[in-house]
């Protein structure tokens, strides 16, 4: 399958899954859950959905909540796409968000910021 087609499918899945996640009312998803990306396997049988969690939610609880809704979300993907086979969904926290946080923390430490964001030296 071409890279362009794969990217197009991933973008469409991100849109569908994001809409479905936004409509969930699971208490385990207390923080704002944002779908940040989707990666499909070469044969489209599996899709890893990456998400970030804002507003202090528990990442493991969020994963459990998303996994419990995977069937409903997968059904929506099947109904809204013309794929021969609907990919099996797996939810993973987006590692990029944690990396960015670590980098920002390191930069603040190196630059001597006092943590209030105004860049003053201690």
From Swiss-Prot:
One example of the protein's molecular function in GO is: ribosomal small subunit binding
Biased composition, Basic and acidic residues: where in the chain? 95-111
Q: Which GO terms describe its cellular component?
A: cytosol
Q: Where are the annotated segments for Disordered?
A: 95-122
Q: Which InterPro entries match?
A: KH_dom-like_a/b, RbfA, RbfA_dom_sf, Ribosome-bd_factorA_CS
Where would you find this protein in the cell? Cytoplasm
Its keywords, alphabetically, are: Cytoplasm, Ribosome biogenesis
Q: Name one GO biological process term.
A: maturation of SSU-rRNA
The entry describes its oligomerization and partners as:
Monomer. Binds 30S ribosomal subunits, but not 50S ribosomal subunits or 70S ribosomes.
Q: What functional role does this protein have? A: One of several proteins that assist in the late maturation steps of the functional core of the 30S ribosomal subunit. Associates with free 30S ribosomal subunits (but not with 30S subunits that are part of 70S ribosomes or polysomes). Required for efficient processing of 16S rRNA. May interact with the 5'-terminal helix region of 16S rRNA.
> Which family, according to the similarity comment?
Belongs to the RbfA family.
The protein, known as: Ribosome-binding factor A
């Amino acid at each position: 399958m071409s890279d362009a087609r794969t990217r197009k499918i991933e973008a469409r899945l991100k849109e569908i899954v994001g809409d479905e996640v936004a409509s969930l009312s699971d208490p385990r998803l207390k923080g704002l859950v944002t779908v940040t990306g989707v990666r499909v396997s070469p044969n489209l049988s599996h899709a890893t959905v990456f998400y970030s969690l804002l507003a202090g939610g528990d990442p493991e609880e969020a994963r459990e909540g998303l996994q419990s809704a995977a069937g409903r979300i997968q059904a929506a993907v099947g109904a809204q796409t013309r794929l021969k086979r609907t990919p099996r969904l797996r939810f993973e926290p987006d590692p990029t968000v944690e990396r960015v946080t670590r980098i920002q923390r390191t930069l603040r430490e190196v630059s001597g910021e006092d943590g209030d964001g105004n860049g003053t030296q201690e």
